[in-house]
């Protein structure tokens, strides 16, 4: 294999999750997304829903980011907020799952967790509004107003979480090795491109 790991960050409605799942299936490797949260939930004996609430509570402030990173480097977890502890637990879970072999990782700043590993390709998937609206409508069967609300909510959540924990912009294409427009390439087209990196 040319690369062992693919980390995928994606815009809500771009089909990124579906692309990751199909890629993993075709390459016969695991795809970790919600599983990362489940690992943390088991460790702390809390629900996945609670973890998601902690993620939503993350601020994108510079001071928060510096604080979390300094505590992580010193190994001092006592002063960390619940949000900071969850982030570090997710990073540890990703690193642990990577030890099992080749995999696709969805979101959760996986590229940051695996930055010291070789064979990692960082991917960002985006699409035009029309494509995203169509996919969201098909997946959720909701009104256009609700659809736009959800799209903005989830993209903002992902951007804040990424920024707060990496000090980088989630949608800055310079943070990725490959950027794919699923609206132009299609779901299968994106899978084909990524598969060529693995086999």
Model-found features: residue ranges?
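Glycine-rich phosphate-binding P-loop
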Residues: 6-24
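Conserved phosphate-donor/acceptor-positioning beta-strand/loop module used by diverse small-molecule
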Residues: 116-139, 143-152
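RNA pseudouridine synthases
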Residues: 110-116
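Short beta-strand-centered segment that lines the nucleotide-binding/catalytic pocket of NTP-utilizing
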Residues: 30-42
